[in-house]
C-alpha cells in the first residue's frame, strides 16, 4: 500500500488522473472485439453555437455514469465525441463573434472564417469535457463539417433521392426573414404576443356589407377567397357569391369549408397566400390562385396607389389600418394574446413563402414512425409521449434546404444543355464529398451546369450521427462495411428532451428510410438544468452558470455528484447545498479510507489478492457477516439500477450505505476489535479488517462511475496499480450469503440508537462510560454483546425477560 497523503487536493489529482487515463488509453475502444461484447453510444455532438453551460455538463455526465458502469461490467465501449459545427447556429455565432454578415462577403471567405472560429471553440469544448472526466475515446472524434461527415451526409441524401424519399418542389414553406432561409417545422417555436383583431368591412358584388376579423390586414392584397363554415346559418345565403376586398377592390369567391371556426371573430375569414397553414390547405383544396406579396427580406412587393410597396410587414400593417380607419372600413379592434410561430434561432415571426426547396418525405411515414417509437426502449418511459405527440402533429414534410453558406452542400447541379434545361444532375458516390460550386458532374463542363447554391439543414447531417461513426449509411452503402455492420444499430442514444422532436425524430426517420431499422435499442433522455430559483437560465437574467468557475471551486467529482442526484429526465435546479454535500462526501471518503487503511498491513498479501468469495470463511464475526450480506444486497440493487439507467437511485443507495451503515455504525462498532490492542480476539480482529478492506474497495467501485478522480486516487493508494475504471472491474459477489439471524445485528443497531439518543439528550459524550445496559425484547450473541459494549462504552449488559419490542434501561456511574 502506498503512503497515505495527509490531504486530498482535487485540483492536482483531477488533472493528474485525466492525463494518466489518456496516456494509458483506459477508455480506448478495441475494434477487434466481437459485436456481442460492445456497448455502442451515439453521443450527442454539441452544437458549436456558443459557450458550453452547466446544462451541458449536467446532461453529458449522466451519460458518462452509464458508460463507465458498462465498461466496468466488462463491455468494450464505443464512446465517440463529435462537434456539430455547421449550419445556421454556427453561422450566427461567427457573425456575432466577428461582427460580420455572411451576405456581405465572398462565400469562400466567410467559410474560411467559420472554420477558424469552430476550431477555436471546439478546443474549449474539448478541454471542458476532459476536465469533467467524460470517458470518451478521443480517437473517435468527428466534426459534422469534416470531409468524411460531408461524404456520409451527401451519401444519405443520394440514397434517399434514389429511393424516392427526397423530392424537390416549388411549394409553400416556412421562411425566416431575418436569417434569410427556409426552415423546417421543428425549427419553429410558438411565442405569445400581444396583437389586435381587426374587424374589416368587405362588400358582396351586390353591395351587401360583410365583416371579417383578421390579425393580418397587410395581407389584404393577397386575399384570394372568403370562407364560412357550411353549417353556419348566418352565411349560407352567401353561397356561390363573390366578395370585393376593401381598398384593393379585387373580386374573390365566397366559399364554404369545415375548417372555419364559427366562434372565432365573425365566423367569416379571408384566405390569403399565405398567412398560416390553413391558408395553404384552402389554397390547395379549392384550387385558388397564388398572390405573393411578401419578399424573402420581409418587405411588401405590391406596387399600388396606396404606396405600400417596399414597406416592412409591420409598417404596411400600420398604414393599411390607418387607411381603413380613414375610410370607415375598420369597425372594431380588439387586443388579443396571439400565438405566433417564430424562428427558434432568430426569434423572428415566420412567413410562408412559395420557394423551390428539397424535402424528405415524412407525412407518409407517420404510422411507421409511431411504430418505431414503440419499439424503442425509453428511459424514462414518459418521454416516449413527446415523440408520439410530435409525430401526430406533423403537417409538413421535412424541408432540408437552407439558403446559407457554412453547411453540407447538396451534391446537385442543374443542366443548361440544350434539350435538357433544368434537368437535375447528381454526383456519383465515388465523387463524394463534392462542392457543386467547385466540382462538376461526370461528363459535364462548367458552362453546362448551374450548381445548387443551398446547403442542407444541419439536422440532415446530425441525424446520421450514428453513421458518421460507423462510416456507412446502410449495409449496401458504406465506406467501411465491416465497421458499419459491427457498430450499427447502436445500443444507446443519450440526449436532452428539448431535441426529441429534432435529433431523435430525424435520426429514427433516416435509419428507417435507409435500413428499415431503429438506429439504437435504448434512448435515455435528460432534463434541463434550471437556476436555483427554478427559472430557466438566460444571459439576460444573468443567472447562467459557467462550468469553469464551478470546476475551479468544487472540482469535477462534486459537479458530477450534483448531476447524479437528479433523476433521469427531470428538470433540476442548480443547488449549492447539493454541491456542498458532494464536497462533504469527497472529504468523508478520503478520511474513511485513511482511517481504515491503517489496519490493512495486518492482512496477508495473499488474502488481499483474492476475491471475498474465496476467503469468505475468514470473516467469522456475526456483525461482519451481516455487513457483508448488506454489502452484497447493495451491489445487486445498485447494479440493477444502473442497468436500468437509474443512476440517481444507484448513487442514493450507495451513499446511504456509506454514511448510515458504514461510517455512522460499522466503523464505530468494529473500531475496538480492529485495533485489538490487547490481542484478546485475533480472529475477530482479522474478520473486521477483512470486512473493512472489502467494503471500502466495493464502495469505491460503486462510487467510481460518478466520482472517478477521488475513487481512482484512493483505489491506487489502497488496492491496485491498475485503474479502477478498467474494463471488467465491477463487483461480482455471485450468491455470496452468510446464513445468520438478522435480528441480532439489527437489534444491536436499535440498542445503539437508543443509547446515542440518551447521551445526546443529557449532553453526554458519545464515549461517556455506562455502568449497565438492561435490555429487554432481544438477547444478543456473545460476539454481538462484545461489539455493543465497545461501541457504547458499557461495562455490563444484562438481558431481561422478553418483550414485544426492544427496550433499554441505562444506568450511569454515580
Curated annotation (Swiss-Prot):
'KMSKS' region, short sequence motif: residues: 536-540
Reported function: Catalyzes the attachment of valine to tRNA(Val). As ValRS can inadvertently accommodate and process structurally similar amino acids such as threonine, to avoid such errors, it has a 'posttransfer' editing activity that hydrolyzes mischarged Thr-tRNA(Val) in a tRNA-dependent manner.
Upper classification of the organism: Bacteria, Pseudomonadati, Pseudomonadota, Alphaproteobacteria, Rickettsiales
Keywords, sorted A to Z: Aminoacyl-tRNA synthetase, ATP-binding, Cytoplasm, Ligase, Nucleotide-binding, Protein biosynthesis
The protein, known as: Valine--tRNA ligase
Matches recorded under Gene3D superfamilies: HUPs, Isoleucyl-tRNA Synthetase, Domain 1
Family statement: Belongs to the class-I aminoacyl-tRNA synthetase family. ValS type 2 subfamily.
Annotated motif 'HIGH' region, positions: 46-56
GO molecular function, a single term: valine-tRNA ligase activity
Assembly with partners or alone: Monomer.
InterPro entries: aa-tRNA-synth_I_CS, aa-tRNA-synth_Ia, Anticodon_Ia_Val, M/V/L/I-tRNA-synth_anticd-bd, Rossmann-like_a/b/a_fold, tRNAsynth_Ia_anticodon-bd, Val/Leu/Ile-tRNA-synth_edit, Valine-tRNA_ligase_type_2
Residues that hold ATP according to the record: 539
Subcellular location field: Cytoplasm
UniProt entry tagged with the keyword Acetylation: no
Residues that span the membrane, as ranges: none
Chief place where the protein resides: cytoplasm
EC number: 6.1.1.9
